[in-house]
Amino acid sequence: MTIELKNEYLTVQFKTLGGQLTSIKDKDGLEYLWQADPEYWNGQAPILFPICGSLRNDWAIYRPQERPFFTGLIRRHGFVRKEEFTLEEVNENSVTFSIKPNAEMLDNYLYQFELRVVYTLNGKSIRTEFQVTNLETEKTMPYFIGAHPAFNCPLVEGEKYEDYSLEFSEVESCSIPKSFPETGLLDLQDRTPFLENQKSLDLDYSLFSHDAITLDRLKSRSVTLRSRKSGKGLRVDFDDFPNLILWSTTNKSPFIALEPWSGLSTSLEEGNILEDKPQVTKVLPLDTSKKSYDITILN
């Protein structure tokens, strides 16, 4: 099912499959969101839950509770992105989706939960709020959540990928960890200098010749994608998320994904117990955790 919100600036669409954003068009009909061309990547803006990235061998290990050191299978980016969400509510400027675990999810992730995703259209901005409720009455629930929106790049006919830059809200000097595409794991100790006293990064396909770029040490909580020719662009604000992942495929795809994550793929030096992973969010019984980010069209 497709749902549409519209105001004087934007027309935005969503679908119940994955509970995800599927289109952002301005008043002139220009599409900003990647439209899932399978030649490159058939995704658009999947929701990553209850993990971001990959676990070692896809296994989540849990501390002794009712079962001693139970192990569950959770593949890269979690399981909700391929599931049908329930449409809870639609009004003039917002839509709410929700999902609860089925039997297969509970076999591998040992917590009763409800994930609600609230999209709000306000002027030229779309806010996505993730509301994660722990429905357990006695157990604290560990989770990670992330957004994976991909944007057309170039946005305008006649432009090319290299005409675009990323602009950070702060001057940045940071390194990035080594990644292993075949497993999805990271080596947080083996790092390569990436940004050196700069607020902008010119895009080039060579940036993604190996894998995604994991920015886990950014000061900025905002990044702008902008054409140096037409000025067209958008901004992603991610105050609630400590990490930003930049990604495109290795075959020169006409898109870039700007991904706020609450956690990272498993690193070589960390263990496998989900509750002990760095940056894990823990929700008390019957409590709710909320995280949000914003996409703003700039023209």
UniProtKB/Swiss-Prot annotation:
Note: This gene was sequenced from pMG820, a laboratory-derived deletion of the naturally occurring plasmid pLP712.
UniProt key word Methyltransferase: no
Sorted UniProt keywords: Plasmid
InterPro entries: Aldose_1/G6P_1-epimerase, Gal_mutarotase_sf_dom, GH-type_carb-bd, LacX
Taxonomic source organism: Lactococcus lactis subsp. lactis
SUPFAM superfamilies: Galactose mutarotase-like
Induction: By lactose. The operon consists of lacABCDFEGX.
One MF term in the entry's GO annotations: isomerase activity
Name recorded for this polypeptide: Protein LacX, plasmid
